[in-house]
Amino acid sequence: GLPGFAAEAVLPPATPVVTPAPVTPALPTIAVTLNGRIEQVTIDNINNPLVVISTTAGDMLLELFPAEAPQTVANFLTLADGTKAFTDPATGQQVMRPFYDGLIFHRVIAGFMIQGGSPTGLGDGTPGYEFADEISAVSLGLDKMLVLDEQGMPNPILGVRSQQDFQVRVLQPLYQKLGITSKESLEARVAEVDQLLRTLNVKEIYEMLGYRYLDTLNSRTPVQGVIAMANSGPNSNGSQFFITLADTAWLTGKHTVFGKIRGGVAVLDIIGKTPVNTESRPLQDVTIKTIRPLLR
């Protein structure tokens, strides 16, 4: 070989430059004794309240999300532990006692949800007050979802199943907003309505229905296993709640999601499969014994 040159210099193989993937911190896992056995449960935040809903079918552990729905979580916890006054439906008197103890899951729909917290056990009744929703339409992306797709079909999130649904959920609120009150006034503005329908987003149509959003919050979609407030329309929360048995996209933006089941999922499944009558009421009562913070 020539002086000064190494014969057949072997270059090290080129090292590909790998950008390390961002490390997602592992979610905290805790050991909890539920239904007589130890369960390892993963939670979002070690500081979030954990509550046990103890029922005649067994116990469920829920993690609540105060950063996402502060007033809703506070209402639920204080009603549950008896530190919040409510109106007793039987006497009309203001009382303080653990609100949920002894109430039933009055509505169970297999593959959808279980609902409880009605003080009469009939699905009606409130704690004697109502409070506002805590939902961010922007964090849920409702302002980016159009009401109609390019084919003119309604967005599945609207839960429109018929022409009648479309009338009630989309057209009526839109006509009201535009001050269209007769067939004549509609005919005069049909092009305007058509144009609006093409650009209208889900947040806007829900606002026309009376929903009000707090876009400083960070909300979650109602996926399987969340606990959310039941209501009778915008800002009509009281004591009733439901726990989902499946993803329920069509409830997005209409119900405050304030927690998620973390343990005792088998108990939720058992309650969800309870035989019911035609009104979706369990044939045998599933009763809430207590709702209390997990001792840890």
Language model: regions and residue ranges:
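Cross-family detector of peptidyl-prolyl cis-trans isomerase
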Residues: 2-296
